[in-house]
């Protein structure tokens, strides 16, 4: 399994792309969130990922920096069906609010022949806590993260019989979400900022976004082996990795 970060920033970053990534195996890809616009196409190109090789997309919630890029993915993949006689169905997963928003946006901004692909070639799958599916030959179980601002969904991907990758969206981990995080080999978590800046700004209280210190302590508490922190500020990208690493220890 390979993880490719396509973007690491929060909603209004200008020096990097919004947080989204692919999970890949055998040159097939699972796209998790899509960022806020057609910048997703450049990020995929720069990462040598062909849209035609994306087998499924998951949108965690309806905020612009996660869902707007989905329209561009649908536009590009839809063309594969319309022009190139592409055969493989494309599955999109999300909670009821996310799937409804995707459908409404596509109806508003894409030609009808793209919208005609829904339910036949492009499959919209509504998921909630306990729903399971198989992507890249791996079992995935979805769960509601009990977000404060808007309905948001996370998932566990089982890497083998005993190891899992857990994605918990872009809000602070709730008490009810901890059971999904516990004993993860990999955790993907929101970490808005680090160090003194985080202490002074207090993103947990203001925006329900985590800090590096909060996530590091969470990992220690729940026996998480590895963590990917994203959805961050872009004010000091050159030193961000160093600052975050130091604050996590």
Describe the predicted segments one by one.
Residues 38-91:
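Active-site metal-binding motif and surrounding structural segment of the metallo-beta-lactamase
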Residues 28, 86-90, 222-227:
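A short helix->loop->beta-strand "cap" motif at the edges of active sites that frequently abuts
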Residues 31-35, 54-65, 69, 95, ...:
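Active-site neighborhood of phospho(di)ester-bond hydrolases with catalytic His/Asp-centered motifs
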Residues 13-15, 126-196:
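Active-site-proximal loop/helix segment associated with metal-binding centers of metalloenzymes
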Residues 86-151, 160:
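Metallo-beta-lactamase
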Residues 173-249:
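Cap/insert and terminal regions of metallo-dependent hydrolase folds
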Residues 49-52, 88, 120, 182, ...:
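Structured loop/turn residues at beta-strand edges in well-structured enzyme cores
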